[in-house]
């Protein structure tokens, strides 16, 4: 048996690559450099890697020529290179949308009769179709809302945080189920769901804030019953969907015996630092829960003076650190943006 060792070193703006081949030898009991394999010892299963398909991604994709589209899709979802096998898609608009929008903004439409999937069909599905064709099979989708429709919120706006009004909690649960069904009725594999992107953050873009108790009530009394009524309980629900350093506190306060069987995992972001110990604590305290990084990107405002390769090193650092502590998968943010890091409702950031 042979071991191939690949090393890429970046130092003083110089890239050096090495490849070494080592022959395995029988273990003769000597104290030496050795690789021990213990088949009975297992760690976490790796669910896979992927990225987000937002309206911004779809808009840029629509402006590319066919050759550019094929090259991009092949690099991400082909079998030889990055091998992406998951995607994250926003429910309604997010910060990386062409404009604010809602599938149904009619406050009087209690039965969602005016629900429109046209924006998803225009911007999201062409990218998803190309990805699945390249991948060779259906790609598991994680859906995440940034905000309920404006009329359902106390501040009557999609942005600037605000809270979901209790009287609309049931309707918001039905709205989420409708989104899932729109995808599934077209044959797409919605497999994962988070209840709210960054539930502690009051953002100048689409956002909505919850406490752990509020989210627990929403899940237990509204969302899960709605999923059950629509035969959608096979979907994996992920808690949190925010930065790593507060993940354990949120899960500890929210998770109890009443909702334990409703929850499959915890979704985390990377924007506040490494916090690899937070991943380890989650895995130690809740070993049955999966841990996915659901969003990560390099923000221009923080890293504008470093090279592209240095940014790649940040990804490698985060991936290795998280996987070593028990992470099950990684979803990058936008897989494609324009040269200005958009389109975006407020600011820009680079895509991989």
Language-model segments: which ranges?
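Active-site neighborhood of glycoside hydrolase catalytic domains
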Residues: 185-186, 206-299
């Amino acid at each position: 048996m042979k071991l191939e060792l690949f090393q890429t070193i970046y130092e003083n703006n110089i890239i050096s690559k090495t490849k070494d081949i080592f022959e395995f030898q029988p273990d003769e009991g000597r104290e030496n450099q050795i690789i021990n394999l213990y088949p009975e010892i297992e760690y976490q299963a790796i669910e896979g890697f992927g990225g987000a398909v937002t309206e911004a991604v779809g808009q840029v994709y629509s402006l590319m020529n066919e050759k550019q589209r094929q090259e991009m899709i092949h690099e991400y979802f082909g079998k030889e290179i990055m091998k992406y096998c998951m995607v994250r898609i926003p429910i309604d608009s997010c910060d990386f949308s062409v404009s604010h929008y809602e599938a149904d903004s009619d406050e009087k439409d209690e039965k969602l009769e005016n629900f429109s999937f046209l924006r998803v069909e225009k911007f999201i599905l062409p990218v998803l179709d190309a990805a699945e064709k390249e991948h060779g099979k259906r790609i598991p989708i994680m859906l995440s809302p940034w905000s309920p429709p404006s009329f359902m919120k106390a501040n009557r706006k999609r942005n600037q945080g605000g809270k979901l009004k209790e009287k609309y909690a049931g309707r918001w649960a039905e709205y989420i189920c409708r989104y899932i069904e729109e995808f599934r009725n077209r044959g797409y594999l919605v497999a994962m769901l988070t209840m709210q992107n960054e539930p502690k953050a009051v953002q100048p873009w689409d956002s909505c804030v919850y406490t752990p108790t509020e989210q627990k009530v929403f899940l237990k009394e509204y969302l899960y019953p709605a999923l059950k009524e629509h035969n959608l309980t096979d979907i994996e629900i992920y808690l949190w969907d925010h930065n790593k350093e507060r993940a354990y506190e949120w899960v500890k306060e929210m998770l109890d015996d009443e909702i334990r069987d409703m929850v499959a995992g915890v979704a985390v972001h990377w924007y506040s630092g490494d916090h690899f110990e937070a991943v380890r604590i989650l895995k130690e305290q809740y070993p049955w829960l999966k841990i996915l990084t659901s969003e990560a990107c390099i923000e221009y405002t923080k890293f504008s003076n470093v090279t592209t390769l240095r940014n790649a090193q940040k990804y490698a650092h985060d991936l290795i650190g998280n996987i070593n502590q028990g992470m099950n998968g990684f979803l990058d943010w936008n897989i494609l943006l324009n040269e200005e890091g958009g389109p975006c409702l407020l600011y820009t950031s680079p895509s991989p």
